[in-house]
Amino acid sequence: MSGDDLDERIETYYVRVRGVVQGVGFRHATVREAHALKLRGWVANLDDGSVEAMLQGSAPQIDRMLAWLRHGPPAAHVTEVTFEEHRTDKRFERFQQH
């Protein structure tokens, strides 16, 4: 990707997902979904049992990923998804699991 026009359309969001989201393949499924949507960023487990993610892409890509995160993979039981825009000049190269 190159050009200022394209960069202006890239958004970055920090997301927290709570519920039964660890030990159910949530991160792996999140990586698969992010790759399908051509998102960049990462996903990781937190000590409190929740999952965090950094999503980077266009507004429609982010919206579709947030919609998917609200239910996650079949074994998950999502009770809450919170997100906020994260202003950064950093550009992730791919989406990965931590």
Curated annotation (Swiss-Prot):
Listed EC numbers: 3.6.1.7
Entry keyword annotation includes Aminoacyl-tRNA synthetase: no
Similarity annotation: Belongs to the acylphosphatase family.
Domain of life: Bacteria
GO MF annotations in UniProt: acylphosphatase activity
Keyword annotations: Hydrolase
Residue span(s) of domain Acylphosphatase-like: 12-98
Protein name: Acylphosphatase
Catalytic activity: an acyl phosphate + H2O = a carboxylate + phosphate + H(+)
Gene symbol of the encoding locus: acyP
Active site, per annotation: R27, N45
Main enzyme class: hydrolase
